[in-house]
Amino acid sequence: QLGKDYALKEHIILDLPNESFISSALINKELKPNEFNTVDDLVSGFVNSYVPFRNMIFLSFALSIAESNNIDQIFVGFNKDDSINYWDCKENFINHINIISGLNTTIKIKSPFINLSKKEVVLLGKSLGVNYDNTISCYQPIGNVECGCCLSCVIKKEAFNE
């Protein structure tokens, strides 16, 4: 829906093999993502929603598509809260991906929210008139309804309630 609201020119959906990532509760339906009541419950380190090298895989595809279509910028929505448990959401990761892609292209990965908390991103969006009604951050939504207790839901809930 958001793509339509913002007149997105093209939306590409890639079909990736899930069976390679069975250690992640986001892929392996036999595992249930860790549940949290508040962000304070979160401990820095491994959470079972981690998909090994997920963002490197996504960015590799994005770089390939961008180069094939003469696109020189790719934007990602990583924020400071993402980097607590996911190494591939950190500024250092983006910097290194840009170094690697710079060996052959001028394409730049941009991460404008990398130093902002989820709360700061929400406040910025509200100040710009972003409609959050159709957004889902949940790791295990049922239809369009968020679970409310996975890591992503708890971070989002606290960002909107603070």
Per-segment meaning from a language model:
Residues 162:
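Adenosyl-5′-phosphate
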Residues 5, 68, 132, 144-147:
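Alpha-helix termination/capping residues and helix-transition junctions
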Residues 1-128:
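ATP-dependent adenylation/nucleotidyltransferase module used to activate substrates
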Residues 11-15, 131-140:
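Conserved S-adenosyl-L-methionine
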Residues 60, 134-158:
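Local cysteine-cluster metal-coordination motifs and their immediate loop/turn environment
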